[in-house]
């Protein structure tokens, strides 16, 4: 396996959880743990991005975010990675395509919050994402209606897997997606930065009981 890339066995189901993690926080941990349980995943890879093309201002340096993410997300079935920096990709569709070439016998599931589903139609090649890998959507209370009524949700409504069958998502053939409600930790990276940078986030270092997107 290439240096900087996690190991995966053929046939494994890997959840891909991408984001700037600027900073990582207990909400990210909570979502990751819920995704592992709900979607029948063997592992989850955090994809700490070099930058987010939908954000006007760049995040903190990648090495700082990687260090903080590894301190925050401690779980034997979760890998914190900077895969996109090694691949040179900047958009999700390209990252997924590259990973499928590198790991041809691994099954990937893209994980996202309902807030991201609501704006998925703005992502470059967003249809390619849904038609390439199953998508698991984890919703907190305030994001549910806008996500369910989003252009992406309406366009792919026939391919939605019922929440009661969510554990089958990892073995489904794309296009397939599943929308589940999860109790959320009331924290966000945006609010942490607005409250004074990363100092508040560092108070949660080492927590493993919760996670979010």
From Swiss-Prot:
Write out the catalysed reaction: nicotinate beta-D-ribonucleotide + ATP + H(+) = deamido-NAD(+) + diphosphate
One of its GO biological process terms is: NAD biosynthetic process
- Kindly report, in one word, the top-level EC class recorded for this enzyme: transferase
User: Under the GO molecular function aspect, what terms does this record hold?
Assistant: ATP binding; nicotinate-nucleotide adenylyltransferase activity
Keywords linked to the UniProt accession: ATP-binding, NAD, Nucleotide-binding, Nucleotidyltransferase, Pyridine nucleotide biosynthesis, Transferase
E.C. number(s) listed in UniProt: 2.7.7.18
Instruction: Extract the Pfam families matched here.
Output: CTP_transf_like (PF01467)
Which biological pathway? Answer: Cofactor biosynthesis; NAD(+) biosynthesis; deamido-NAD(+) from nicotinate D-ribonucleotide: step 1/1
Q: What does this protein do?
A: Catalyzes the reversible adenylation of nicotinate mononucleotide (NaMN) to nicotinic acid adenine dinucleotide (NaAD).
Entry similarity comment: Belongs to the NadD family.
* PANTHER family recorded: NICOTINATE-NUCLEOTIDE ADENYLYLTRANSFERASE-RELATED, PHOSPHOPANTETHEINE ADENYLYLTRANSFERASE
The protein's name is Probable nicotinate-nucleotide adenylyltransferase
What is the originating organism of this protein?
Ruegeria pomeroyi (strain ATCC 700808 / DSM 15171 / DSS-3)
